[in-house]
Every structure is written in structure tokens, then in C-alpha cells.
Amino acid sequence: METHLYYDTLYQYQGGVYPAHICLPTDAYLPMRVDCIESLYFRCVFFKNGMHYTEWSKLKFTVISREIKFKDVLKNADFDELFTGLVVMTIPIPIVDFHFDIDSVILKLVYPQLVHREIVLRLYDLICIRPSSDRPSEVSAKNIGIDFYQLTSQGNKQTPDEEKRCLFFQQGPLEPPSTVRGLKAAGNAKPMQFPAHVNEKMTESFLSDSWFEQKVRCKKILDFTQTYRVVVCWYELSFSREMQIENNLLSASQLKRVNAADFWDRTDRYLRDIGSRVLTHIVKTLQIHNRQFKQKFNCNFPVNFSFEHLLSFMQLGKDFWILNLTLDSCIIKAIICFLGFRNGRKSFLAQDEVWGDLIDCSKGSVIYGEKIQWILDSTNNLYSTRREKQNKSWELYVDCCALYVSEKLELDFVLPGGFAITGKFALTDGDIDFFNWRFGLS
């Protein structure tokens, strides 16, 4: 893997980091194919009198969007599984006082339309792949010192062949002593004879050559939630083999103060909080308008359509929406856009687009975080909606509701018949703190 070779060499001279060489295979649990990944980020979680999160750092990566076996690239790899696609990367883990009981690495995958997936990996699984019984031989240890771009393994010292050829180009006078340039007539001087150059067998060893001939140990690991597969690679010639890494055990009292699932627990608490606030905002907005609905979207409804019918759909839609609320929700994406736009980032949506959660009350299912286009009909001043892979506007389905949020945090909860409860969602300092921690936004 050229990507692993490049970053192993880079981090060797950078110092202070452990290179975790990993591959992320195409997985059924990933939302899209690996070649759809727009960017990768990582952060580490260390124990420092509590849970300490490093800042998000962007990762370079290589995508292999074809069938591949490790042995096709690394012939001495101990892994022969066939993958339909891979994302190859190296995570530079800072060398600190490690606590394998609690330390972890979080890998963030960013897809189109602000779809994020986080993969939490135990630090122990990433670092402890190296066999404890393996030790570098003298030959292998010598190869580790070879520079990636070095032409020979002898530094600036010339090879015997180079010394032989340089004898004919030694510095000296242009003419013999006592010769005045231009006064001596040209004679029939015998031309200088150069010995024929004989190609000698190359005996030099290059790291870029030996990298693909070395022993490679590969191991499949699962993330913290036992959902995603990751392949960790250990290379015999990696500079990390010489590192002495110690595990600092936590005492019983220290373990009581930390939570290995802190990353997920904080996220779940926030989702429950913001979901409750959105629903409270909808109810209060309805009360402010004396429980009156205004039709905003273009669709027909039965003559016997009652107010109680709308209220029952409103309650049902709210319950289904909050039941499986995720970070893909329109409210989360709208806040990301709002904070990003405030910090000078470009808009993710066109002027006539919003983020939408589409609620199907007949099935009890929700499609979260869709990009929705609003189309205004000038004849009746009502909107129709459009989204990819859907020919029929969502408001035309009689048993469906929708929640729409714009990049300005303008919120619409749409009921059957195109009736909408419209308001504007307000952020708190807690929202800003959460998005700065979770997404690197503020």
C-alpha cells in the first residue's frame, strides 16, 4: 500500500506519533459506497483526569473502488479476504501516556448532503496488533534506515563504478603549464579514450522496494458499537516496531470517573434534548396562533377533513419523528449550515431549498435529512416540493407529515392537507458548545 508507505516515512521524521495503518472496507452498514466519501477526520480520546478530546484533524486517504485482495499487493500479507472496495489511510496517534482501558480514536466519515458517520476504535486494537515475539533482524533493521528518496544506501559515498567514471573528470588546468592559449597550432592529438561502461548488477536496497516484500500482519477489528469492520495493518519495516509503548493502568477510583461510551452518551442526551425542544416549539407556536392552521403547500383534502383529525396526525407524526431521531435529521443539518455560514463557509443549499424529515404515519417510518426544493405556484401562492428519486410531492400523500428547516433555522411542521405550523428555532449556548465538540463548529 503506497499510502501506508508514504505516511510511515513522513511520520518517522515528524516524530511524536504512532502510525496506525488501517483500511476501511465497503460495508453494508455504511450509508454510501466508499468512493462517495468526501473527507475524513479523526480525533483521539485520552484519559487526563477525565475524558480529554483532541481537536478534529483532517486525514488524507486513498480510495480503491474495485475488488482487491491484500495478497495481490503485498505478497507476504497474512490476509487473503476479497474486498469490493477499500479506503486506505494512516492515523497519526500522538504519543502520550496511554490508558488502554479507556483511550480511543474516533474516525469521522463525511458524505454528500452533510451525512456523517463516526467510527470509534479502541486504541488497544490499533496499537497492539504487533506480535510481541517478533523482533527485527539485523538485515531488516538496516533497511529501516534507508531513506525513501535516497539513491544509494551509502549516503554521499560513491560506489566503485561512480569513482571509476569520475577519474576522467578530475579538476585540473585547461592547458599544460607555459602554454599560451591561442598561440599553439592545433595538432593531431590523439582523442581521449573512455573505457566502456559495463552495467553491474544492482545490489542497492530501497525501502520502496522492500516495503512490498516484507511481512505484513492484518487483523479485522470491530468498532466500539460492534457495527463497522476495520482492517489494521502491521508492517515489519515500519518505524513503529522500534517504539516502546506502555499501558498505564487506571485505578478503581479513576475508572468510576470515566465512561468509555461518553462520546455516544453525550450525543444521545443532546438528541433527546433538541428533539424535545423542537416539539415544544411546535406546540407553543400553535398556541400563539390560537390553534389555527394555515395551508402553505399545494394539495387537495377531503371536505369532511376535521381539526381533530389534524391534531391526531400532529401527535402521531411527532412521536414517530422523535422515536428514532438521529444526527441525520434536518434540524441537525440546518444548525450545521447556520453555524458554518456564520463562520464564513459557503451555503450548502440553493435559495429555494431546505432540509426535510419526511414522516410516514402509515408505516411509522421517517426519512431523515433530505434536501428538499420548494417550488412556488404564483397562481395560488402555495408551494410544491421536489426531491431526488421521488416523482410525487410529499404533501400529496394523505398519511404523511414533514418537518422542514432552512439554513436560517426557519421551521415548518407540515400536516396532511398542506397545513403548516411555522416558526423560527432559536439556539442556546449549549447548542453551540455541542456542535463545536461534535462537529468542530462554533
From Swiss-Prot:
GO process annotations (BP): chromosome organization
Entry annotated with the keyword Oxidoreductase: no
Keywords: Capsid protein, Host nucleus, Late protein, Viral genome packaging, Viral release from host cell, Virion
Gene Ontology CC annotations of this record: host cell nucleus; viral capsid
Chief site of localization: virion
Subcellular location: Virion; Host nucleus
InterPro entries xref list: UL17-like
UniProt key word Transmembrane: no
Role this protein plays: Capsid vertex-specific component that plays a role during viral DNA encapsidation, assuring correct genome cleavage and presumably stabilizing capsids that contain full-length viral genomes.
Recorded family membership: Belongs to the herpesviridae CVC1 protein family.
Record's subunit section: Interacts (via C-terminus) with capsid vertex component 2/CVC2.
Protein name: Capsid vertex component 1
Species this protein is from: Human herpesvirus 6B (strain Z29) (HHV-6 variant B)
Gene: CVC1
